[in-house]
Swiss-Prot record:
Presence of keyword DNA damage: no
Similarity comment: Belongs to the glycosyl hydrolase 94 family.
UniProtKB keywords: Carbohydrate metabolism, Glycosyltransferase, Transferase
InterPro entries in the record: 6-hairpin_glycosidase_sf (IPR008928), 6hp_glycosidase-like_sf (IPR012341), Gal_mutarotase_sf_dom (IPR011013), GH36_catalytic (IPR033432), GH94_Enzymes (IPR052047), Glyco_hydro_65_N_sf (IPR037018), Glyco_hydrolase_94 (IPR010383)
Protein name, as recorded: Solabiose phosphorylase
Pfam families: Glyco_hydro_36, Glyco_transf_36
Substrates-to-products reaction catalysed: solabiose + phosphate = D-galactose + alpha-D-glucose 1-phosphate
Function: Catalyzes the reversible phosphorolysis of solabiose. Catalyzes the phosphorolysis and synthesis of solabiose through a sequential bi-bi mechanism involving the formation of a ternary complex. Is probably involved in the metabolism of solabiose released from solabiose-containing compounds.
GO biological process: carbohydrate metabolic process
GO molecular function annotation: carbohydrate binding; glycosyltransferase activity
EC assignment: 2.4.1.389
Record field: pH dependence: Optimum pH is 7.6 for phosphorolysis and 7.8 for the synthesis of solabiose.
Biotechnology: Is a promising biocatalyst for the efficient enzymatic synthesis of solabiose from sucrose and lactose, in combination with sucrose phosphorylase and beta-galactosidase.
């Protein structure tokens, strides 16, 4: 386990007590107008505008990249000795007497001490303003009076658009002396909007400032020893046509035991007057602490309605706290490439359990990127018009899950525009999607792949218009069944339900006839009619997704379902989770896709790609394999016993997209965390598939699937205004199902009971 920190008792915070991590450990803070990453040193980047998890913007997002290169630090300087240091250790890297960094849900707090001076810095953003709000505290812990200077430093970027001329030709800084505000301007004509200015301000009057990076660092200086800090004085520079910074120097004389607190603001603006308005608004007495209290209350409300208690504290902490924050980030900020059609729908599926209003908003937003004929773009921000075969199949399960969570059936009749022309109800969007995919079939009566499927890097199988995806066909079978269920139970159209089920049967027959390879399902046929994911291939002979989805969708039945899972166990297992495929490719094959050109053991080429691994957990639960489900969960879990964060580099509180695979020299390491569909599926894997709380239209099904060594676990589940207290007892060391179900002290037959709808608390007791 990680040797550099630990969770607090309730898991809402992770406290770093050591600086020597494999890479900077990130937290994210955001609102609709700003997104910032804050690492355990206090550094990080920030951006203004349309939220996307990428900081370096390609053309088309209209975002301003506020802060450059992670350069956002506080320097503490002793006037007597000239020594200086950072509360977060980096970049000066002076050995501190005391250090900690606390990452919470939407905030970070640094605390450091050196030479009798303690310094703390807390950062968050409020609900509405494009400003990082830092609260700095200095304490004199020594027995004598001390003069201390604090230098708050941020480097402005102010980029994020296609440039046709030199950036530095348009940039300069103002210092608004009457308010002591630094404003960095970018007036380039190519800007898509006016919000490409940055500003720095504070609640106490500074004793100096710098706005030019060269002036602050010195001609050959760096962030580990900035010239202004070394000298102990700023030059009050005004930058023009050069790299810009916002540095405010504050000088304090502290008696023994004395403490001082002040606030620093770093944010975005569209000119001097906006910078003034934001500064005055946020620095009004009591405003910052009121905003912080609102943030804490918001996070409490988000986390308290679904809370699990399992034998493992880390599972509880991540499920109850951190994975919800991670899914929220994914839903609101998208991914590094923007907002993906499939990604946003899967995020909506997850958050519908604890933020149903956001789920509804995300479904609406995503459906606007569906064409009238039913196909969907890959994503937006910026618009990616590639047609991946899987877009349409995610609509039905997501909308269905939202309806089962909320009972908001009127949503089906809400009008949402199509991307190209016209509009349709949500229900019409769903029907159009499954009908499009059901008719978009190739030679083997399987769904045409086009630019790829869920596996983005299978982008060579169908570009010629003939390749077919076995996995998308299986996912279509699942989507058709979900749509048919809605048609029968909510729309009350039995004829339509039969039509959809007939389509599902045809797809199932085609997959079983043409997609079965003898011991497992193929991944695809390419444009040349060649099998992808076949035992006849030396590389990429088996793919994970077709096997897991065949089981979880019910397409594979009986012996064949068992063969799928056995193949996964025997051929795709690894210490870090199930592999996307095996063996990894070593030679590029354009008729399969870019993944064949990747170094073995990265991205989709033979890695424990965690998002795909979550499908395996669900498949295990559907098959009643509680031990195997939790084994896979444990391998994907960050900072696991087999792959601690000291090695993987993954934040101990956030799921990663993938671990490097066994064929890679970096096996078990991670490239990044936070922005991944893994989070939503891991949340659902625990709260729905493992602890077994399945929402329905007018009922609840209880079907736990847990490891046999869990003697007891429980969950609080607020659902449609009622509170259900679920307790699962497993004295018989079972893995799935139940022997007895008791509701409010009364034993009932079966595993389904009606939704109460009375707003009260009800006990649900399970004996396995």
């Amino acid at each position: 386990m990680a040797g550099f920190g630990n969770f607090t008792e309730n898991g809402s915070e992770f406290v770093f007590t050591g600086t020597q991590t494999p890479r900077p450990m990130l937290n994210y803070i955001w609102n609709p107008r700003i997104l910032s990453g804050v690492n355990h040193f206090g550094g990080g980047d920030g951006a203004y505008g349309a939220r996307s998890a990428a900081y370096i913007d390609p053309e088309g997002r209209g975002r301003s990249s506020l802060f450059r290169g992670g350069n956002r630090y506080f320097y503490i300087r002793d006037a007597e000795t000239g020594e200086f240091w950072n509360p977060g250790w980096y970049p000066v890297k002076r050995t501190l007497d005391r250090y900690s960094c606390t990452h919470g849900l939407g905030y970070t707090r640094l605390e450091g001490a050196y030479g009798g001076i303690a310094a703390g810095a807390r950062v968050f953003v409020n609900a509405e303003d494009p400003v990082e709000i830092w609260t700095v505290t200095l304490t004199n812990e020594s027995p004598r009076e001390r003069e201390i200077k604090v230098y708050s430093f941020v480097e402005f970027s102010l980029e994020g658009y296609a440039r046709y001329s030199e950036y530095n030709s348009y940039v300069y800084c103002d210092y608004l002396a009457e308010d002591d505000i630094i404003v960095a301007h970018n007036h380039a004509q190519e800007r898509p909007h006016e919000w490409f200015d940055g500003f720095a301000a504070a609640s106490v009057k500074p004793t100096g400032y710098e706005t030019g990076k060269r002036a602050f660092l010195g001609n050959y200086g760096d962030t580990d020893s900035p010239g202004s800090v070394v000298r102990g004085a700023c030059s009050n520079s005004l930058a023009a046509c050069e790299d810009m910074v916002g540095v405010l120097e504050h000088t304090f004389t502290l008696k023994p035991g004395e403490e001082v607190t002040y606030h620093t603001l770093w944010g975005a603006a569209d000119g001097n007057e906006t910078a003034r308005e934001l500064t005055r608004k946020l620095l009004a007495p009591g405003r910052i602490e009121d905003d912080f209290a609102r943030l804490l209350a918001e996070k409490t409300a988000m986390t308290e309605d679904i809370a699990v208690q399992t034998p493992l504290a880390k599972v509880n902490h991540i499920t109850n706290m951190w994975v919800k924050q991670q899914v929220l980030l994914c839903a609101e900020a998208g991914r590094a490439t923007g907002k993906g059609f499939r990604d946003q729908l899967q995020d909506a599926w997850a958050v519908s359990a604890f933020l149903p209003g956001l789920a509804k908003e995300k479904i609406r937003e995503t459906l606007k990127y569906q064409y009238k004929d039913g196909k969907c773009v890959r994503g937006w921000l910026p618009l990616d018009p590639h047609i991946y075969s899987d877009g349409p199949v995610w609509i039905a399960p997501t909308v269905n899950a939202y309806l089962k969570e909320t009972g908001d059936y009127a949503f089906l009749q809400e009008q949402v525009p199509y991307l190209d022309e016209g509009a349709g109800t949500v229900w019409e969007h769903m029907l159009t999607a499954v009908r499009y995919s059901s008719g978009d079939l190739g030679e083997h009566s399987l769904v045409l792949a086009h630019d790829g499927d869920w596996n983005d890097s299978l982008n060579g199988i169908g570009t010629g218009g003939k390749g077919e995806s076995v996995w998308t066909s299986i996912a279509l079978y699942h989507a058709l069944n979900e749509t048919a269920e809605l048609a029968r139970e909510v729309i009350r159209d039995e004829g339509l339900a039969r039509e959809l089920l007939e389509l599902a049967v045809r797809i199932k027959e085609a997959v079983n006839a043409n997609g079965w390879d003898g011991d497992w399902y193929l991944a695809a046929y390419n444009d040349h009619g060649e099998k992808v994911g076949s035992h006849t291939e030396q590389e990429g002979s088996i793919y994970l997704n077709s096997q897991t989805w065949a089981v979880m969708s019910g397409l594979a039945e009986g012996e064949r379902a068992g063969q799928c899972l056995q193949a996964v166990d025997n051929k795709l297992d690894s210490p870090y989770g199930p592999l996307t495929l095996s063996p990894p490719y070593t030679e590029y094959n354009a008729s399969i896709g870019r993944l064949t050109g990747f170094v073995p053991g990265i991205w989709e080429n033979g890695t424990p790609y965690c998002h795909g691994g979550t499908f395996k957990i669900v498949a295990d639960c559907v098959a009643g394999r509680g031990n195997e489900a939790f084994d896979t969960y444990s391998k994907i879990l960050p900072d696991s016993a087999a792959n601690p964060s000291d090695h993987s580099g993954c934040e101990p509180y956030a799921f990663t997209n993938m671990y490097f695979g066994p064929a890679n020299p970096r096996a078990g390491e991670t490239a990044f965390a936070w922005v991944t569909g893994t989070a939503g599926w891991m949340f659902r894997a625990v709260t729905q598939y493992m602890l077994g709380f399945y929402p329905g239209y007018d009922s609840i099904r209880i079907r736990p699937c847990i490891p046999e060594d869990w003697e007891e676990c429980s969950m609080k589940r607020v659902y449609r205004g009622d509170t259900y207290l679920l307790t699962i007892r497993n004295k018989n060391r079972e893995q799935c199902g139940l022997k007895r179900l008791t509701i409010d002290g009364k034993e009932i037959a079966g595993d389904v009971f009606p939704i109460f709808g009375d707003g009260l608390t009800h006990t649900v007791e399970v004996d396995m």
